[in-house]
Amino acid sequence: MRRRTTTLVTLVAAAVAAGIAVPALAATSSSGVPTAGPADTPGSGQSVIDWNRQLISILGAPNVQPGTVHPTRSFAMLQAAEYNAVVSITHASPPYRSAVPAPGDARPDAAADQAAHDVLVALYPSMRDGLDTQLNGELAGIPDGQAKQDGVGVGAAAARQLIALRSSDGSSAPPAAFVAGTGPGDYRPTPPKFPAPMYTGWGSVTPFLLDNAKQFGLPAPPPVSGAAYAAALNEVKSLGRDSSTTRTQDETVAGKFWSATPVWTTWNQVAQQLVADRHASLRQATDVFAALDLSLADTTIAMYDAKYQEHVWRPVTAIQLGATAGNPDIVGDPTWNPLTPTAADPSDPGAHSALSEAAATALTAFYGNHQPVAITATADPGVTRSFDGLAAAADEAGLSRIWAGQHTRIDHQAGQQLGGQVARLVLGDLHQPTTG
């Protein structure tokens, strides 16, 4: 049973300093899930958290990267490089793609720090000074000697490998041309500003672990002329309107809450606190973040492939043009507007549903589904959303898009199916345990 509460909170100091709105999470240990034991690899998981936070800070800096899904690639590259740097030395888990040569006495913590630094410098060269400062601080805590030097060399090699692997992945290709449809159900730019469709080519980016973006084909969405679609659309029409009288106050808060921050940032913040709460070792932390961010990156690629393959119109279009749907159970309302602005891409599958299910599936493999979480956002007013487990948080993230007028329940269910499938594949490839 899901438990949700809303409380006023203080802005997170780190987020204010960075000038960005990011969530934080307070996790309560569950007696049913074992806590991390003593570090089995030199170093702690804190350095992995530090580099993850650094990337979030970079993404919040002005003019570093426009609003885009590119950060899912950046998170995956960062975490895969740290992961490979560690497992190339410890051989504790299968490498991502392939290991790099590593002396047996090399320090894994030095390797992880160097790998993280080098990947982020390659992605965001204008941030080198701050990244150099962070690297020097992390390495200063590691005893000098040959093992440290060897670790630095392994980390640099792991970063070079990751950068080379992703150098021609299609992420920098010009957006693919998209011709908007005019028939019932066809996606087209949405009111009020009618922006051009975004991320039209992201489904063609080379996945990190999927064989291809279509590996998990979703069932075709139901026709807009059918009863199933009408029922789903009418739910959004009632609950998702800006002036809805059927949406509860708590649902309104949730709809705005999950719209305020990129969902991949939210789930990385969740992972940060789970790792910190369990005092995870370096190896444990790199395992967790690699599973999370490789899942998010490949889900994003597969999701955009599906979105532009199906090109389903958004609820705001369907409702305002309802008379053109050819469905007697859909009554148009040209005055209808959603609670939050509509994203400039097709509706099915839902992004929050897909990405949150992927994240929850990955994290549940390590922490179980009985880990209470309380996610805090710095949007005005600041609120905390509390849940009995990761699955409940993911479920609300997806349903919030119905309450915000962004997606139908059909989109939500398709997204959940896709995100779960991708995350389970990633966990299998990294030989991490799966649950459920």
PLM region descriptions:
Residues 27, 33-436:
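Acidic/polar surface patches and capping/hinge elements
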Residues 1-29:
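Secretory targeting and sorting signals
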